Amino acid sequence: GLWSTIKNVAAAAGKAAIKL
């Protein structure tokens, strides 16, 4: 659902932030 998508995007953004 929409919430799952939001969590997936947030997780991806978090991983990207860690790499930076």
From Swiss-Prot:
Modified residues (Leucine amide): L20
Subcellular location: Secreted
Tissue specificity: Expressed by the skin glands.
InterPro entries attached to this UniProt entry: Dermaseptin_dom
Keywords, ordered alphabetically: Amidation, Amphibian defense peptide, Antibiotic, Antimicrobial, Immunity, Innate immunity, Secreted
Biological-process GO terms, alphabetical: defense response to bacterium; innate immune response
Pfam families xrefs: DD_K (PF12121)
GO-annotated cellular components: extracellular region
Function: Antimicrobial peptide with moderate activity against both Gram-positive and Gram-negative bacteria, and important activity against Leishmania species (L.amazonensis and L.infantum). Acts on both Leishmania promastigote and amastigote forms. Shows activity against E.coli (MIC=17.8 uM), S.aureus (MIC=32.3 uM) and the phytopathogenic bacterium Xanthomonas axonopodis (MIC=2 uM). Shows low cytotoxicity against mammalian cells in models of peritoneal macrophages.
Family from the record: Belongs to the frog skin active peptide (FSAP) family. Dermaseptin subfamily.
Name assigned to this protein: Dermaseptin-N1
Species name: Pithecopus nordestinus (Northeastern Brazilian leaf frog)
